[in-house]
Amino acid sequence: MAKPLVTIVGRPNVGKSTLFNKLAGKRVSIVEDTPGVTRDRIYAESEWVGKKFTIIDTGGIEPENNDIILTQMRRQAQIAIEMSDVIIFMVDGKQGLTDTDNEVAIMLRKSKKPIVLVVNKIDKNVEENNIYEFYNLGIGDPVSISSSQGLGIGDMLDEVVNKFKSEGEDEEEEEYIKIAFVGKPNVGKSSLTNRILGEERVIVSDIPGTTRDAIDSFLETDFGKLVLIDTAGLRRKSRIKEEIERYSAVRTMAAIERCDVCTLILDATEPISEQDERIIGYAHENNKAILVIVNKWDLIEKDDKTMENFKKNLEMKFSFMAYAPFLFISAKTGQRVHKVLSEIKKCYDNYSKRIATGVLNDVISNAVLMKEPPVVAFKRLKIFYVTQTDIKPPTFIFFVNNPELLHFSYRRYLENKLRQSFDFEGTGIKMIFKERKN
């Protein structure tokens, strides 16, 4: 289940960035008294009573006007609101209710998202009675806090996490293989999605994603039940190019967290960018199955070494995830598109693979016989037994005499033996070394 997204919204200078920095545990947003200082949406991870979530700080929402920066901030806040699972609507208890607060409240009510109304700047110098006028917003019971002094934040977070969906609400989605097509704008995500949907012709339904604003396409295919998580709508004609990456970052992150198989789509005509590396790095860190698709292969002049050389370049760029397969396609012409779902299914099967304990220990025992662990600090690692404890990704616990005796090269050797024996192409694997207690 993906971490919920919580967005802090409100007009400028009510204290959103101060609260964001408290929740993020570090100073991420610039905090000044000048309206409009938080121009970009910024996000960070947070946790309360064991529940993890992503918190988003937005630029303040001003009434419509001709100021280009304020217009962009308002648009960005609207995108964040669309994506959110819960919205923290912050108002200023010292200044009181304003016309802009009422305008924001109207916009939030239209979103039909769970809202926690927070009255900030209620401290020793401001009476608690100041919160009552905010009932007029029609949002619900206000929660009073002082973000600068840290007062009332626990009560506010209790309200926030109580509005999260329970895990049971996502059970219907669990029977599907969740696939995210991610990548920079214009690499062909939309074309590939449309090509796959058009070829399969077995769409069950197009319904709003259960936890995000993207449209998820539910399919029943020869490869099982699939969900294509749509991140293709990141670019809209009304948005200038410079805004696209800012809008896409959180959506891409959310799609990766939801998916089982992260499919990075690259443009064969362009060099691999830092953005590509960040996207795939995030999928790797989140232990997702990964497939790399190189699109627009029809536009490349080729000889018998072109694909091999391209693969070598990719392997150097993505050396930290050598397990990921590559597929060269053209969404425009349909070249090799028929292989996309079968490759995704293979990655997923390996991602959710279980190995019998007996077979697993036979492989590791033989590996140790072929090559003993190196001596570290005059001692040698001894592996007593290994067991698989989880899937998605496959997770193995090795019970040993002393984990500190494990050399990184021997860890890599054991991983290679597991991969050679059980075919974990397309997925990372976790290897945990624990001391066996007598």
From Swiss-Prot:
CDD domains: EngA1, EngA2. GO terms for biological process: ribosome biogenesis. GO terms for molecular function: GTP binding; ribosome binding. Keywords: GTP-binding, Nucleotide-binding, Repeat, Ribosome biogenesis. Residues 353-437 form the KH-like domain. It comes from the Bacteria. GTP 1 binds at residues 10-17, 57-61, 120-123. Pfam families: KH_dom-like (PF14714), MMR_HSR1 (PF01926). Signal peptide: none annotated. GTP 2 binds at residues 183-190, 230-234, 295-298. The keyword Cell division does not apply. Residues 4-168, 177-352 form the EngA-type G domain. Associates with the 50S ribosomal subunit. Belongs to the TRAFAC class TrmE-Era-EngA-EngB-Septin-like GTPase superfamily. EngA (Der) GTPase family. GTPase that plays an essential role in the late steps of ribosome biogenesis. This is GTPase Der. It comes from Clostridium acetobutylicum (strain ATCC 824 / DSM 792 / JCM 1419 / IAM 19013 / LMG 5710 / NBRC 13948 / NRRL B-527 / VKM B-1787 / 2291 / W). The gene is der.
